[in-house]
């Protein structure tokens, strides 16, 4: 009965019926547009823009605009979107996720809503996972938009600011998710409004949306600067950790990836470093370095988590298997790995700006996405991004044969069987794609195939430059390709001549991923557009997923049956157990991402306030009123501190107040105790503010209005940037230890919100105090110019204990700020450091 009701009231079915009706309406007018000349078709863009200006909405234009793009696509590329692609386009325009199977033409589908929304002139961002796909799509699909009179931009990491600004100014901009996030952060660190590159965030269509909004949701984008620190401790901690023995000196939990010293290990450490107590406050740094060295040796594996290339430790993305060049683990883990591998240890970094993809993409007015696999994460898309997942039917039925899993007792038996299966298929000429979850697995299978004399291509983090070419050739007769973790997403595997007759592409999975979605992505490489295909997963009881969730019991059962390594089992019970393990991991990861978002929202609200005010500073012509208000707030606090309400006026420490006023706001001797004696705090405030304004006016007269306005901006920007950097670090420190509050029966999130707010208020007060002091006391130089507090560079996060996907929040970095020679001197003179206290260096 419930099943019948669900079918009757299924909202997805209703949505699809609505989309199908719109697709039929578009199809019904195709003849009108086929008869138009090229010029008449192009003129439709101008007509649509005029109608929008007169009050029409994009929804009003949808049917006609989609029909125009469809016809333009046929003329320019020779491709004519099917009805199911029109339905996918409507889903995207509605701000939803279109789940379309591999080979169903997602890229072409996106052109429909992208064109329609670009007509508003507010800009549309098409987001892809790598620069190869961004460049390819901008070139291929860009021709359609340019034919219709719209401009297309491509935003790449290597571009200058001027080139980026031009790319963002276009009607449609193709970019990677990383570049969009980093450009947003960099825009909020600029010193002049003209240096900004992005426009307000209007509409984004994300290709492979699950990869960006789910897999990478916990990845904070970080812009960091160098912090001067000694590398000696890393070397010493590394040498010590090499002497430790597993279980005896440290314990390692494979589920949570947590490593910690045992009592015996702690005693060893105290002996080795000649100290009494490793947990003494003065040994915090040593303790931290030993823990990071342990993590580097035990939890971080070479060729799985990172590779060593050209003397550098390069992080491997655990989802795509790609190298993340230029990114570094924070909290000293990267340096610990460098020490482990015997490489040159580079300086730690300090965070200047940070944002997660979750919070960046939620800033768009409208967000849409497409992928082949999103249904398993439907709840997360709905709860966090307010996006529905709409499964678009395939143009032709899927005839792929998905075989049940084959389960072996050991890894050795499993890999032998994989090599044997590949060899047999190779003999018949059937192309094979072997999917692995780690670089080392791909190299092991490659070795086994070499021994059998089977030519093959390996696609992993070490050689992803040839990725697209290898993937495109993977469907040719006799091709054998080994790929790590869905490398090659977004690139179609087209079947070569005679391959259909051999059964299509065979996909062989060597391990189940902890996410069903990634298994489905691998399956989806085969059987595109109604082609035949076959998929087979090989598992062993020693696989990480099986070990994590009770493989011991199953192993004992298999032993009782006398099962050896040459015979696999195809058991529905084991397959169900694997799937329930995956569901459990997915649930854990969803909870983890949701919790991170709640914590990150605290920093998001603060970041939005600071960035908004910072923009007002660089956009404003005159900051005089703002600066005066800052001075007044700072002065009010100073007076309140020396004239507490609970004390009698004769107990007030007026000498201290006079000293403070003269050293911070006025000149020596400008205020006497007699001036304020017997007055109420309000009267003191009025009197002192009058004198401050007089001094301010004199300063402005001396240096001229123009110079004074620029001076105010320099001071305010510098104060905001340096205090905000300190605040990010302080919030991180708070975040690290907040979970311990749960032991005191308090809600850690509530505590974090309250303390974070108090710290933010304190930061605002510090900014006001610093601005007041520098504006009133610093001297103005003739060659006045705004300067960055620290030069920034992009960096990565650090995997955290208990974080199954190795995607985690960035950890705090202790700052030791080097004063640049051209920076204002810390003594408050207003001169450059090199002309003041730094003159002797």
UniProtKB/Swiss-Prot annotation:
Task: Please name the gene that encodes this protein.
Answer: secA
Cofactor or coenzyme needed: Zn(2+)
Keywords of the record = ATP-binding, Cell membrane, Cytoplasm, Membrane, Metal-binding, Nucleotide-binding, Protein transport, Translocase, Translocation, Transport, Zinc
Record note on cofactor: May bind 1 zinc ion per subunit.
Give the location in the cell.
Cell membrane; Cytoplasm; Membrane raft
Enzyme Commission identifier(s): 7.4.2.8
- CDD domains, from UniProt? DEXDc_SecA, SF2_C_secA
* Ranges for region Disordered: 786-813
Q: Where does ATP bind?
A: 79-80, 85, 103-107, 492
NCBIfam families named among the record's database cross-references: PRK09200.1, PRK12904.1, secA
Say which domain of life the source belongs to. Bacteria
**What reaction gets catalysed by this protein?**
ATP + H2O + cellular proteinSide 1 = ADP + phosphate + cellular proteinSide 2
Hydrolase is among the record's keywords: no
Q: Name one GO molecular function term.
A: ATP binding
Q: Name one GO cellular component term.
A: membrane raft
User: What processes in GO biological process is this protein linked to?
Assistant: intracellular protein transmembrane transport; protein import; protein targeting; protein transport by the Sec complex
Keyword Transport carried by entry:
yes
**Could you describe the subunit structure of this protein?**
Part of the essential Sec protein translocation apparatus which comprises SecA, SecYEG and auxiliary proteins SecDF. Other proteins may be involved. Monomer and many different homodimers can be isolated, some of which are not formed in the presence of a synthetic signal peptide. A single SecA monomer interacts with SecY in the channel. Only shows some colocalization with FloA or FloT membrane assemblies.
Name assigned to this protein: Protein translocase subunit SecA
Q: Which residues bind Zn(2+)?
A: 825, 827, 836-837
Function, please?
Answer: Part of the Sec protein translocase complex. Interacts with the SecYEG preprotein conducting channel. Has a central role in coupling the hydrolysis of ATP to the transfer of proteins into and across the cell membrane, serving as an ATP-driven molecular motor driving the stepwise translocation of polypeptide chains across the membrane.
From the UniProt annotation, give the residues forming the signal peptide: none
> So what family is this one in?
Belongs to the SecA family.
């Amino acid at each position: 009965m419930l099943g019948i009701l669900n079918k009757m009231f299924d909202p997805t079915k209703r949505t699809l019926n609505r989309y199908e009706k719109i697709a039929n309406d578009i199809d019904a007018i195709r003849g009108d547009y086929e008869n138009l000349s090229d010029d008449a078709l192009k003129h439709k863009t101008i007509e649509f823009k005029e109608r929008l200006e007169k009050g029409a909405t994009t929804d009003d234009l949808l049917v006609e605009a989609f029909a125009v793009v469809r016809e333009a696509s046929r003329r320019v590329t020779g491709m004519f979107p099917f009805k199911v692609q029109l339905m996918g386009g409507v889903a995207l325009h509605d701000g939803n996720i279109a789940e379309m199977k591999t080979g169903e033409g997602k890229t072409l589908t996106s052109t429909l809503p992208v064109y329609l929304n670009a007509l508003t002139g507010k800009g549309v961002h098409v987001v892809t996972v790598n620069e190869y796909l961004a460049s390819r799509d901008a070139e291929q699909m860009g021709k359609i938009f340019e034919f219709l009179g719209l401009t297309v931009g491509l935003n790449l990491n290597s571009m200058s600011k001027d080139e980026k600004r031009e790319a963002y100014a276009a009607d449609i901009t193709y970019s990677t998710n990383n570049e969009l996030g980093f450009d947003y952060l960099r825009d909020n660190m600029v010193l002049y409004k003209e240096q900004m590159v992005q426009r307000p965030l209007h509409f984004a269509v994300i290709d492979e949306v699950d990869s960006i909004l789910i897999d990478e949701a916990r990845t904070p984008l970080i812009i960091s600067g160098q912090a001067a620190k000694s590398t000696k401790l890393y070397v010493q901690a590394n040498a010590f950790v090499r002497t430790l023995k597993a279980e005896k000196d440290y314990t390692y939990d494979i589920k949570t990836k947590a490593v910690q010293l045992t009592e015996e290990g702690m005693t060893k450490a105290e002996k080795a470093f000649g100290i009494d107590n490793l947990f003494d406050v003065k040994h915090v740094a040593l303790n931290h370095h030993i823990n990071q060295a342990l993590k580097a040796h035990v939890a971080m594996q070479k060729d799985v988590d990172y590779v060593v290339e050209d003397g550098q430790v390069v992080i491997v993305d655990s989802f795509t298997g790609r190298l993340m060049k230029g990114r570094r683990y924070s909290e000293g883990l990267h340096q610990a790995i460098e020490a482990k591998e015997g490489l040159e240890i580079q300086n730690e970094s300090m965070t200047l700006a940070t944002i997660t993809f979750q919070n960046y993409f939620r800033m768009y007015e409208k967000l849409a996405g497409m992928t082949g696999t999103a249904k398993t994460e439907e709840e997360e898309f709905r709860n966090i991004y307010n996006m529905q997942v709409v499964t678009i039917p395939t143009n032709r039925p899927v005839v792929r044969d998905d075989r049940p899993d084959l389960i072996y007792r050991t890894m050795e038996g499993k890999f032998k069987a994989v090599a044997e299966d590949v060899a047999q298929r190779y003999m018949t000429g059937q192309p094979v794609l072997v999917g692995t979850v780690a670089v080392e697995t791909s190299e092991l299978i490659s070795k086994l195939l070499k021994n059998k004399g089977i030519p093959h291509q390996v696609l992993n983090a070490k050689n992803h430059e040839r990725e697209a070419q290898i993937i495109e050739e993977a469907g040719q007769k006799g091709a054998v390709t080994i790929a790590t973790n869905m490398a090659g997403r977004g690139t179609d595997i087209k079947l070569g001549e005679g391959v259909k007759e051999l059964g299509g592409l065979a996909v062989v999975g060597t391990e189940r991923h902890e996410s069903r979605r990634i298994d489905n992505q691998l399956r989806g490489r085969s059987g595109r557009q109604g082609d035949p295909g076959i998929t087979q997963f090989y598992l062993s009881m020693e696989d990480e997923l099986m070990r994590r969730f009770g493989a011991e019991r199953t192993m004992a059962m298999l032993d009782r049956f006398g099962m050896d390594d040459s015979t696999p089992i195809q058991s529905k019970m084991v397959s169900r157990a694997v799937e329930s393990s995956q569901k459990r991991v997915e649930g854990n990861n969803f909870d983890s991402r949701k919790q991170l978002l709640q914590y990150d929202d605290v920093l998001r609200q603060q970041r939005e306030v600071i960035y908004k005010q910072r923009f007002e500073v660089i956009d404003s012509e005159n900051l005089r009123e703002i600066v005066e208000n800052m001075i007044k707030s700072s002065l009010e606090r100073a007076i309140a501190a020396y004239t507490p309400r609970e004390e009698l006026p004769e107990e007030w420490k007026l000498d201290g107040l006079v000293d403070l006023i003269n050293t911070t706001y006025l000149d020596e001797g400008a205020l006497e105790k007699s001036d304020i004696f017997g007055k109420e705090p309000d009267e003191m405030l009025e009197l002192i503010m009058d004198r401050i304004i007089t001094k301010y006016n004199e300063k402005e007269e001396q240096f001229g209005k123009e110079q004074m306005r620029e001076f105010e901006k320099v001071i305010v920007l510098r104060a905001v940037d340096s205090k905000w950097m300190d605040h990010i670090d302080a919030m991180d420190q708070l975040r690290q230890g907040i979970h311990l509050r749960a032991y005191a029966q308090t809600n850690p999130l509530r505590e974090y919100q309250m303390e974070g707010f108090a710290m933010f208020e304190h930061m605002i007060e510090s900014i006001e105090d610093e601005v007041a002091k520098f504006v009133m006391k610093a001297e103005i130089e003739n060659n006045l110019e705004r300067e960055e507090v620290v030069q920034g560079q992009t960096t990565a996060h650090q995997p955290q204990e208990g974080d199954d996907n190795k995607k985690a929040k960035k950890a705090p970095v202790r700052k030791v700020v080097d004063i640049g020679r051209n920076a204002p001197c810390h003594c408050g003179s207003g001169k450059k450091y090199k002309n003041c206290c730094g003159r002797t260096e």
